[in-house]
Amino acid sequence: MTILICIPCLMTGGTEIQTLNLVQALVAGGHRVVTTCYFEYSDDMVVRFQKAGSEVVCLSPTGTRVNGWRGILFLYKGLRRVLKQYKPDVAHVQYMAPGAIPILLLRWLGVRQIIATAHTAADIYPNLRLVHFIQRHCVRVFTCITELAERSFFGTSRLYNENTPLNKRNHFTIYNALPPGFSIVRENRSFVRPITIGVVSRLEEIKGMDLVVPAFAQVKKRYPDTRLVIVGDGSLRVKMQRQVQECDCTE
C-alpha cells in the first residue's frame, strides 16, 4: 500500500518527530511511504525521514510559505503533481495551518481515504464548524493526540485500538508514542540540592512558552538555586530573552 503523509513543515518539532515515528511504523509494516512537505523544511529533518524509509517531496524549493489564494493554487498544483506521480491509496494529513485546505484539495483531486490528525486542543479555533464538516464529510478518520483534545473538538472521546470498528463514529484518540527505552525517573526529588528544570519546545505562544520564564521566576524566589535550561527556537526568542533580564533570572 502506498501512503501519502502531508505536513506543512519539516523542522525540528514534536509534530515532526511524531510523524517520523509514524513513518517508521508504516515502513516496518511493509508500506511505501511518501512524505509531502508544503513549506518550510530543514535538510537534517528531510534526511531523517529518508533514512526512516520515506520518499520526501518538498513542494517549495526554497522552503518558504505561500499564503492566500496564491497559497491555495500552490498547494493544488503541488498535490496534484504528487498524486499523479505516486497514486497513493491513503493520505494522512497533519491538521496544522493551512488546516483544512489540503484535505479539501485532496478530496477534490479524488482521494477518498483520508486520515487527519490534530495536534492541539480546539481552543485555538474561533469556531469548529469547518473542523466538524471535515470530520463528517471529508475524512475516513479524525484522530487527536489526547482524549482532552478530542473532547474539546467533539464533546466525547474514545481511545482507539486495533479492534475499534470504524462505523458512524470516526473520531478517536491515539496517543503519541514514546521512544523505545524511554525511562521515567521515579525517585522523589527535593529542593535540598539544586534542581535543573529543562524545557524543549518551539518558542511560540501556542506552546505556552510566553509563561515559562515568569513562572520560573516565582519558583526561583523560593528556591534560589534552581536552574532553568530552555532548548528551542521560535518567534518568542527575543521576548523570552528580555523576560530573563526583567525577571532577574540570568544567574
Residue map of PLM features:
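An amphipathic, basic-hydrophobic alpha-helix
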Residues: 60-90, 100-108, 130-137
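Nucleotide-sugar donor-binding and catalytic loop/hinge architecture
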Residues: 1, 184-196, 221-222, 248
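Nucleotide-sugar donor phosphate/pyrophosphate-binding loop at the beta->alpha transition
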Residues: 70-77, 112-113, 120-139, 151-162, ...
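N-terminal strand-loop element at the rim of the active site
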Residues: 5-13, 17-73, 162-167, 235-237
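Donor nucleotide-sugar binding/catalytic pocket of nucleotide-sugar-dependent glycosyltransferases
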Residues: 57, 139-185
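Conserved donor-binding/catalytic core segment of Leloir-type glycosyltransferases
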Residues: 4, 189-207, 213-216
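Short His-centered aromatic/hydrophobic patch
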Residues: 93-99, 118
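A conserved nucleotide-sugar
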Residues: 30-34, 209-251
